[in-house]
């Protein structure tokens, strides 16, 4: 153990500071007397020289302090060679010192003093740099310095050559479909580059020269003359000659050739009489230039694209020649022969549908009504507020049936005895009749599913003729695809003369008729007979009101009442008055009728019960639609039975 003896003077010396020379002497003595690894006894006795050393250290100047710091460092190094218990004792004595006085030999102070010594920075860099650029990367910015460094040995990487060409950015035609996934044609997949657009200055210049001179530019046409082609020569007169056409060419190629001849004939008429030019058009190469992979056509396409922006639409729609008609096929000749800009608007106007006057839909006869009213829905939400018992086995009239989706749903699922769809637009009636085939396809799919489930049970009882039919049907079209996708072609429409199906079975119970339900005068109301049990009038009253005014709408309601049998039902869905304002400027007659309307939609119920003759009415519900404009209340009006008259 370490025996420690404290005297009064020793304790007083601890309050100050011991001399590092005395510490060094004591440590050396103890290390000599007691070797490392053995237990030592340290006796601290009174030393007369300790007070003198304390006074000396307190009165020393800055130079003496620095010397004591060096001595303290040496003493600390020697203490590390001593025993561990002795080192712990010294640390304890140092920790008892006052916080105001810091000895230069203190551990943290010693390390800080060592860190403040000046470090030697490198001066020789192998790559020729400096302290701020050791790798000499700045030399890559100067070509001369780079060449000098790489003259003997490639110490640094060579400077890459700068590409002075601007970066080409391809812009899709439709920013909402950058990958062109919605278009099935390959011609529309070409991306537009702003570097090759040419700008508007060149377009105006060509337009200016084309308007003044009227000359035909034939540069860049590398078409050779061959058999089966059309030659156009301008010698003061225009001559168009057409020779043998290949028998193997299709009808589309012949129409393509005709449009080429017409466009070349037009261009020859605009040329001057003093200027003689020869142009030859090869029929075989004319079809090949439509392919974007052909190098000559690609050069012409770039040149045409730089000349006018309208060329993009013409070149992209070139792949739709069969669907766009004969006018769009002339785009091939325009690409081969870049005519002046005065002919381009004529070509573009023929293909741009927005240039044509839009149909106003004066009577609300929208051709995509169910598409935007019920987007992504298989059934009309108005069906949920109706009761199937109202229609089962009854005679039904649907006023304003449009394309007949609601009419066909009622006819197929609720099995009325007969249902008639009436609309003023003949094209909508034609579409409704074609939609019967769609519903028949669904019926066949259901039958095929049922038959597929029962084929295994009834396989032994099938006759020979039915087996042959099954074999032919299996070879012609897979049963699984018929179940999942329906037949390839819809079934034919049933003939009206035949009565093979019993009444009430679809599609024998549905009929579509074109007609105007609003009579010309009130006198014709006297001739109306009772024919129907249920009459539907869904979202029609606004169009009757705008086109025929209050008088026409009142006549419309009176005819509905007379058309119903006793106890009949009238299902009405009127549009609100706020929706009238959006369509008041369609025609002059509509605008005039709009300002003369006095019978508002909120007054229909009182008018139908007091003046028309309906006994009662009830609100059966409001259709739940995504659009608030189509969330309209539906009312049911009752006609008195015959016994109560």
From Swiss-Prot:
Protein's recorded name: 7SK snRNA methylphosphate capping enzyme
Reaction it catalyzes: a 5'-end triphospho-guanosine-ribonucleotide-snRNA + S-adenosyl-L-methionine = a 5'-end methyltriphosphate-guanosine-ribonucleotide-snRNA + S-adenosyl-L-homocysteine
Keyword Cytoplasm listed: no
Consequences of knocking out this gene: Transcription elongation and RNA splicing defects, as well as aberrant anterior (brain) morphologies.
Domain Bin3-type SAM: 380-642
Keyword Nucleus listed: yes
Function: S-adenosyl-L-methionine-dependent methyltransferase that adds a methylphosphate cap at the 5'-end of 7SK snRNA (7SK RNA), leading to stabilize it. Also has a non-enzymatic function as part of the 7SK RNP complex: the 7SK RNP complex sequesters the positive transcription elongation factor b (P-TEFb) in a large inactive 7SK RNP complex preventing RNA polymerase II phosphorylation and subsequent transcriptional elongation. The 7SK RNP complex also promotes snRNA gene transcription by RNA polymerase II via interaction with the little elongation complex (LEC).
Enzyme Commission code: 2.1.1.-
Similarity field: Belongs to the methyltransferase superfamily.
Bias (Low complexity) ranges: 309-324, 349-361
Organism for this UniProt entry: Danio rerio (Zebrafish)
Chain intervals with Basic and acidic residues compositional bias: 1-10, 450-473
Biased composition (Basic residues): 199-210
GO molecular function, a single term: snRNA binding
Matches recorded under PROSITE patterns: BIN3_SAM (PS51515)
Subcellular location: Nucleus
Compositionally biased intervals (Polar residues): 15-45, 56-68, 75-89, 263-273, 282-292, 325-348
Keywords from the named record: Methyltransferase, Nucleus, S-adenosyl-L-methionine, Transferase
